[in-house]
Amino acid sequence: MDIDMSATRQQMLETAEHLNQQMTDGIPFTWETLEQALTSVTEQDDKGIHGWICYFAAFYQLTTGNQEGCLHYLDESVRCLLGTDQEHHVARVYNMIGIVAHMQNNLSLAMEQYDKALDYTEKYDDKMVHSIVLSNMSDAYYLIGAYERAVQCHAECIREFEQADDNSTYSRINFRKMLAEYGCCLLHLHMDDEAEKEVGGQRS
């Protein structure tokens, strides 16, 4: 029985890891695939893995413009992930909650969620997600005109991205976005030479 249970859990993990790889490679999800995954790995089967799959369901809902559906799955994801061996994924969930709040122009709530995400990236030493969260925080600072804070966040997240050494399509897209936004912040601070050095140097 123990062997069978272990094999079953391994299959559940493989289901979630396959979705994660698909997201990393920039391959769009279909709702049918996600629905099948949610059905095959229920909360009763494994709470943590189910919570991780809920994150992918939330991402799909966000890409289709369904913010309400996205928040529903994000809430489920947080509830299921916390306190399990999959808890390290919760940083990505809080980050996405922050993104939705950001899109709704609720920047105080966005910052609150980004701060929660950073707490978990630090707890689990997840440099890649940490850099993405910092990039999102810098966007919020940029919107309210706090350009110096935005520059600080961008500089830190670029350093962390380089240390993480993740060359996936998803990460490269995020990195280019970081560089472009970093350059805009520097220009607002009239640091034109620094902007050309940072963005132009990375482009070459």
Show the residue positions of the predicted features.
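N-terminal leader/linker segments that initiate helical-solenoid repeat arrays
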Residues: 1-32, 44, 48
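Residue signature of alpha-solenoid helical repeat architecture, marking inter-repeat boundaries
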Residues: 6-10, 48, 88, 128, ...
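Residue register of alpha-helical TPR repeats
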Residues: 13, 52, 92, 132, ...
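Helix-turn-helix repeat elements of alpha-solenoid scaffolds
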Residues: 23-36, 65-76, 106-116, 147-159, ...
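Amphipathic alpha-helical segments of tetratricopeptide repeats
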Residues: 35-42, 76-85, 116-126, 155-166, ...
